[in-house]
Amino acid sequence: MQGILSIQSHVSFGHAGNSSAVFPMQRMGFEVWPIHTVQFSNHTQHQEGWTGRAFSADDISELVRGLGNIGALEKCQAVLTGYQGSAEQCLAVEDTVTKVKQANPEALYVCDPVMGAPDKGCIVAPGIAENLLNRLMPMADVIVPNQFELSQFAEMEIHTLDDAINACQRALAKGPKVVLVKHLYCLSDDSFNMLLATSEGTYLAKRPHFEFAKAPVGAGDLISAIFTAGLLKGWTPKQAFQHCHDACYGVLNATYQAGEWELQTIAAQQEFVEPSAHFPLEEVTLSQA
């Protein structure tokens, strides 16, 4: 039985981390083997707080060892990683990806390098950003950063579309074959913008921006998951990008229409297989100015 190994956070209530990523990949036809880096009652933006705990790097390694014992690593089609709770967890992920690729050289590694955002800066514990930037992102086949995380990896500021394209080229030169920028903040606030860059070209996706009273959590995890599943279906990066962009819009639209701020992942599940809206991609190049 082939599957996707998904190593990221988990919440019991709502949809963030694995709680946002696992079901969409299953709905798209894939077995998923989740390993949680933390397990919380709910996501951390609830003003009432949350309960739960982080798992150790040894907890991750122990579960991966067990998967290896039953021959699962040879059948692993992809490793998807998101939020890591400690620098040591990043090292356990690095070791896991190495083991999976030794067992199955065709396996993909998709890294969502959760670090922070422009308005918040780096929000992760000491050592995590360094290990993401210097270890996990360079070894990944695909990275799914936001604008802040891309700027950290490319070691340059991003203020314009040209900056973003240049940053993606720098990122591709460091090892990854695909860069999906899950949120490009530097463009117009009238739309929500994403960018895809490969050696074949760079594509901009725009969709309407919803004015939520409280911003939903877990949309980035959803994007990474749907994109990973799309690639494993044999789609080109451009096709997988188009699909995940449209599908994510559908889930956010359902969430907005329901007056909720927890993603309506279950109610809108048909979006994962047949998105209800379509926003054509635009191929972009560096301006001549």
Swiss-Prot record:
InterPro entries for the chain: PM/HMP-P_kinase-1, PyrdxlKinase, Pyridoxal_kinase_PdxY, Ribokinase-like
Family matches, as Pfam families: Phos_pyr_kin
Gene Ontology cellular component annotations, sorted alphabetically: cytosol
Binding site for substrate: 9, 44-45, 221
Lineage top rank: taxon: Bacteria
Single GO BP term: pyridoxal 5'-phosphate salvage
Catalytic activity: pyridoxal + ATP = pyridoxal 5'-phosphate + ADP + H(+)
Annotated disulfide bonds: none
Enzyme nomenclature, EC number: 2.7.1.35
Assembly: Homodimer.
HAMAP family on file: PdxY
Protein's name according to its UniProt entry: Pyridoxal kinase PdxY
